[in-house]
């Protein structure tokens, strides 16, 4: 358990439907803040109470509220919510890759690139149209191929030897981040 707290969620499913949900939190003060509030207030406040993945937290709260009051959510809305969570996950991964990793490797953070990608993810999340995740992922793969990796991402992901993951491809220059990572392989 971390200082920030822990949330355990148990779900019982029968006949394809959620029959019971059990929550255990080491942060009971959060539930006290929400007690007595309207469902709309709860959905609005939940992302403010937890620092990680605020949009996913809000969606989870909305889903829990809808289940509690017996409201049916159309498939199109569930699909849109899924895309929003995926886009937020992309943003979180980009944060780590472009800001945290360089700092750990004593390299300058990729702030400008991160800001551009963060804005693109945020804009896509607002609309969350079908295909937006696929399009953004394709563009990210292209960015990785051109900027971060010594060979195309698909080939890099197929490597199964730790040393090979850090070897430069014959015709490509290493990016600074991979050069720093290779120093750890000594």
Predicted segments, located by residue:
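Active-site bordering "gate/hinge" segments
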Residues: 1-186
